[in-house]
Regions:
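Asparagine-centered strand-capping/turn motif at beta-strand->loop junctions
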Residues: 33-39
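Structured interaction patches on ligand/partner-binding surfaces of diverse proteins
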Residues: 83-110
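Short beta-strand segments within Ig-like beta-sandwich modules, predominantly Fibronectin type-III
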Residues: 56-61, 91-93
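Bacterial lipoprotein signal-peptidase II cleavage site
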Residues: 23-30
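Short strand-edge motifs at loop-to-beta-strand transitions and within beta-strands
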Residues: 64-66, 99
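Short Pro-Gly-centered beta-turn/loop motif in secreted/extracellular proteins
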Residues: 66-77
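Short, ordered, surface-exposed loop/turn motifs in non-cytosolic proteins
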Residues: 40-51
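Sec-dependent bacterial lipoprotein signal peptides
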Residues: 1-23
Length: 117
């Protein structure tokens, strides 16, 4: 009887551990992106989403970032305007990812994808 109780306790513990480890944090949620301005000038961004919408984020100060915003998954075009010059970056956004679109001091753009799971 004792071995049966131990087995049942072990089985329940194993089942609980397995269920917790297999839980995904993200349930096919839309991607989210933000602009990080590590440059020396204010930056404004126009975002053309994969579903045809256009979003503007204006005057992101140097040393700051915008908040994350959700977009439809797919190819998204970011046009950054710094001192009247346009810089473009096209990014394939996937569900369950955050994206950091960063501008460096030379106005180079880098993209980092962060898995939400």
């Amino acid at each position: 009887m004792k071995s049966r109780t131990k087995f049942a306790a072990f089985f329940l513990f194993a089942l609980l551990a397995l269920s917790l480890s297999s839980c995904k944090k993200c349930k096919n949620e839309q991607p989210a992106a933000r602009i990080i301005n590590n440059g020396t000038q204010k930056a404004s961004v126009q975002i053309q989403t994969s579903n045809g919408n256009t979003v503007n984020i204006n005057n992101v100060d140097p040393g700051t970032s915008s908040s994350y915003s959700n977009y439809a998954a797919g190819q998204v075009k970011f046009t950054l305007k710094i001192n009247g010059v346009d810089y473009e970056e096209t990014v394939q956004l996937s569900n369950c990812f955050y994206y950091d679109i960063a501008i460096d001091s030379n106005n180079n753009i880098t993209t980092v994808a962060i898995d939400r799971n």
